[in-house]
Amino acid sequence: MAKILIVEDNATFRQSLKELLFTRFPSMEFEEAADGEEALEKIHGIAPDIVFMDIKLPGENGLRITKKVKAEYPELIIIILTYYDLPEHREAAFQYGANHFLSKGTSTQVIVELVQSILSEKGLDSQGSLRD
């Protein structure tokens, strides 16, 4: 079963994203983290398949956390999801190891399609289970 970690300091946005994804992928496991330190603990503890990472977080920013995580878990898919949708942020996200970059204004359909695409690439079905 696939696991998704949502790293976002805004509890309302974090919950909204979780609800959106749960509606489409109800058998997946979802975890949340409000800052970089909690994110690192959860990544080590649950080994998620996908991480949604905000850039602006309390303490260490999401780009630095992404770099640390990718050094240890290069196969982990990290999606930067931020309001900072500027070319320099996008470029920095990819330099730090992010796999995808989305604006928080991105349509829910695009987010769901991206998750579905990642699951397919990982050999998982639409519910996050291994395909037979």
Positions of predicted regions on the chain:
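Conserved acidic carboxylate
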Residues: 8
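Two-component/phosphorelay signaling modules centered on CheY-like receiver
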Residues: 11-31
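Acidic, metal-coordinating helix/loop segments flanking the phosphotransfer/catalytic sites
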Residues: 32-50
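Acidic catalytic/metal-coordinating carboxylates
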Residues: 35, 61-64
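Short amphipathic alpha-helix used as the core "switch/output" element in two-component signaling
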Residues: 41, 63-73
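Active-site residues of response regulator receiver
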Residues: 54, 82
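The feature encodes the CheY-like receiver
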Residues: 58, 86
